[in-house]
Curated annotation (Swiss-Prot):
Disintegrin domain location: 1-47
Tissue: Expressed by the venom gland.
Subcellular location: Secreted
Domain of life: Eukaryota
Disulfide bonds: 2-11, 7-32, 8-37, 20-39
Record-linked SUPFAM superfamilies: Blood coagulation inhibitor (disintegrin)
Motif window: Cell attachment site: 24-26
Oligomeric form and interacting partners: Monomer (disintegrin).
Record protein name field: Disintegrin leucogastin-B
Role: Inhibits ADP-induced human platelet aggregation.
Gene Ontology MF terms in the entry: toxin activity
Amino acid sequence: DCESGPCCRDCKFLKEGTVCRIARGDNKHDYCNGKTCDCPSNPHKGKHH
């Protein structure tokens, strides 16, 4: 399925919900989506309520 990337292991996509980037500060963790080898950005990053 994939060659390399934070959401790829042994040529397979990691399952949806696997943490691929640990949160820093007020940011939230980023998670694999099960469809890409890249680590998609969390849409809620850096937004304060």
